[in-house]
């Protein structure tokens, strides 16, 4: 007997329309709701840093080595954190395991990575990142640490490390124990000192062979993945320990260095911001209100002060400048910063909560509400950026094609 699939008072297609209405996508000119993000982890397998995109080998599949990397793009306000500090994709080594928060493409027609129409665990439809962070950055943000249970060494050059993650303050939240690989490439950091496995063995801290209890030693771990095992010897999802920070001073030292790396990059490329409003004058002059993007070192925001002069230029969704010599009169605006305000209420992830107003005598086309600009105080550098980081107005550079991302066919079993 056939049974009607629809309720008596429900028109066909109603539920599909309701599902479509529930789909959340970020909107240009606004920062997204963090509670709408999808969280997942993956190994960084490919990077196109100039276009702020790459590929992740997403966890959750049967075997990591059989899981093809899937493309992702950073949202314009999307943040990268490495070693507990702000970073750019170019700073993160390939192979690093990353935690991320992702959304559906804001505009599928303009997506620089392929739109996923048939999602799965290892190929999510949400492929536009608000946040990407390595393991120590995740732990520092979440207030967690790794506790080492024991190490089992073999031949002085490789071993297995048993550890679990838990809140640094203690209490509930202890996670499942993991066994991870380490070898001669694993770096150990103690204060300002870098060590290797051979150094720990020479000091008698770890054995060259056999098992030793580590009594819950508290550390921060850098985690990567690299090939381990095969179809028969299935250890292929085991993580690799790339770094061990043995004390807080060592972690702080790594964070401080990465902060300096990123700070200098932002000063040379200028601070990205959303244009919130433009008040037009009578003869081309205007006052532009813009919100600075978040995730930067506080000292960068402190450079924006009321009364100093600033300069801005048009930018794209991938944060590329429109032109290389951005300080030329025709492609950049200069003028006094007339106001700087800090949002007091809760600031959404991706935003700094800092809004500035700058007055210019001749407004450029790229400074319209909802568009992205890059802005600097005049004491920041005005160096020309490298060719891959500006578009010269070319359409395919402003809107990179998703077809240029790496593709992988199905695995054939011979």
Where are these regions (language model features)?
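Short, flexible, surface-exposed loop segments at domain boundaries
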Residues: 2-77, 82-414
């Amino acid at each position: 007997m056939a049974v009607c699939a629809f309720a008596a008072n429900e028109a066909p297609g109603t539920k599909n329309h309701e599902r479509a209405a529930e789909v959340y996508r970020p909107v240009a000119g606004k920062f997204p709701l963090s509670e709408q993000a999808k969280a997942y982890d993956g190994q960084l397998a490919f990077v196109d840093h100039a276009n702020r995109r790459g590929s992740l080998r997403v966890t959750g599949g049967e075997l990591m080595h059989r899981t093809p990397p899937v493309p992702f793009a950073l949202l314009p306000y999307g943040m990268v954190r490495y070693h507990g500090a702000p970073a750019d994709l170019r700073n993160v080594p390939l192979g690093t395991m990353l935690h991320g928060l992702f959304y559906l493409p804001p505009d599928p027609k303009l997506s620089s990575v392929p739109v996923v129409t048939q999602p799965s665990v290892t190929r999510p439809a949400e492929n536009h990142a608000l946040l990407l962070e390595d393991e120590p950055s995740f732990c520092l943000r979440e207030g967690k640490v790794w506790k080492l249970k024991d190490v089992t060494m073999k031949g002085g050059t490789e071993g297995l490390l048993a550890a679990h993650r838990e809140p640094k303050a203690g209490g509930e939240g202890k996670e499942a124990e993991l066994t991870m690989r380490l070898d001669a490439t694993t770096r150990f950091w103690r204060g300002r000192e870098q060590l290797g496995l051979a150094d720990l063995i020479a000091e008698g801290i770890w054995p060259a062979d056999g098992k030793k209890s580590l009594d819950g030693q508290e550390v921060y771990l850098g985690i990567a993945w690299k090939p381990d095992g095969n179809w028969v010897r299935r250890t292929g999802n085991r993580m690799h320990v790339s770094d061990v920070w043995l004390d807080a001073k060592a972690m702080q030292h790594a964070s401080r260095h990465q902060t300096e790396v990123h700070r200098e990059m932002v000063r040379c490329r200028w601070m990205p911001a959303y244009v919130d409003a433009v008040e037009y004058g009578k003869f081309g002059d205007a006052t532009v209100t813009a919100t600075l993007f978040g995730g930067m070192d506080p000292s960068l925001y402190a450079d924006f002060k009321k009364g100093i002069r600033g300069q801005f230029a048009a930018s794209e969704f991938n944060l590329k400048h429109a032109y290389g010599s951005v300080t030329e009169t025709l492609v950049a605006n200069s003028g006094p910063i007339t106001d700087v305000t800090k949002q007091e209420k809760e600031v959404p992830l991706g935003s700094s909560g800092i809004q500035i107003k700058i007055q210019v005598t001749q407004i450029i086309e790229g400074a319209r509400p909802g568009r992205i600009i890059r802005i600097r105080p005049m004491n920041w550098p005005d160096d020309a950026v490298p060719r891959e980081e500006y578009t010269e107005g070319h359409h395919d550079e402003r809107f990179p094609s998703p077809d240029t991302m790496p593709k992988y066919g199905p695995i054939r079993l011979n």
